Swiss-Prot record:
It is found in: Plastid, Chloroplast. This is Small ribosomal subunit protein bS16c. Gene3D superfamilies: 3.30.1320.10. It holds the Pfam family Ribosomal_S16. InterPro entries: Ribosomal_bS16, Ribosomal_bS16_CS, Ribosomal_bS16_dom_sf. Keywords: Chloroplast, Plastid, Ribonucleoprotein, Ribosomal protein. One of its GO terms (cellular component) is mitochondrion. SUPFAM superfamilies: Ribosomal protein S16 (SSF54565). The lineage of its organism: Eukaryota, Viridiplantae, Streptophyta, Embryophyta, Tracheophyta. HAMAP family: Ribosomal_bS16. GO terms for molecular function: structural constituent of ribosome. It comes from the Eukaryota.
Amino acid sequence: MVKLRLKRCGRKQRAVYRIVAIDVRSRREGRDLQKVGFYDPIKNQTYLNVPAILDFIQKGAQPTETVYDILKRAEVFKEFQFKQTKFN
């Protein structure tokens, strides 16, 4: 299973994070499938490759809670229309 999660970069006391698509069994610093974004909590900057993120989500990738909050704040899910079916 693939997850969208944060990968820590930077130096001590000055962390920046890459948002990556990675296999769920890999370590936090393990080899990722693709880098799909960047997040700097100190400067509060975010860069997202939205087409790549939506592609991974459509293929079944699950974002972690923190990545979900970042994507929600950036309004990525407004572009991704969930197709819901009702069963009576």
